[in-house]
């Protein structure tokens, strides 16, 4: 007879944790996406829902992420910029692509010497005719504007 034990999940990659009465900490240790495929993925919707529960005046956002979808990263950026408390962002490893946008939302930003911030122009994979590609190039230029402004 095989007995299966339920395994408790010990670590949540995207989790808000109140450290004390004055500070809440959040880890973004996965991809920033519009639809979750893996446990450690972060969506703008989930982030907004969790951020609305924070009652402390300070929030520390710890990031180790290759990034993801720019729309989701910009959404999280805007939530952090509009939040009433003090936001500190810490790059624990990588803050790449959409995660770099989230990183710059912090009023205080911490980059240890062994961490890496990677920012790039928007890119995509496309198919179509020459008109489709012209339109895609225009769209990518428009997408770059808010990234640069952040």
Feature map (PLM): residue ranges:
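Terminal-region recognition feature
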Residues: 1-150
């Amino acid at each position: 007879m095989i007995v299966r034990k339920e395994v408790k999940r010990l670590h949540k990659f995207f989790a808000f944790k109140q450290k004390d009465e004055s500070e809440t900490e959040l880890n973004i240790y996965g991809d920033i996406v519009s639809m979750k495929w893996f446990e450690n993925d972060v969506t703008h919707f989930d982030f907004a829902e969790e951020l609305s529960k924070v009652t402390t005046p300070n929030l520390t956002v710890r990031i180790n992420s290759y990034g993801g979808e720019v729309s989701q990263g910009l959404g999280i950026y805007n939530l952090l910029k509009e939040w009433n408390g003090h936001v500190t962002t810490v790059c624990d490893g990588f803050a790449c692509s959409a995660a770099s946008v989230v990183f710059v939302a912090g009023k205080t930003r911490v980059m240890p010497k062994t961490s890496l911030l990677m920012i790039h122009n928007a890119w995509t994979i496309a198919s179509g005719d020459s008109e489709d590609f012209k339109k895609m190039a225009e769209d990518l230029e428009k997408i770059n504007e808010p990234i640069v402004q952040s």
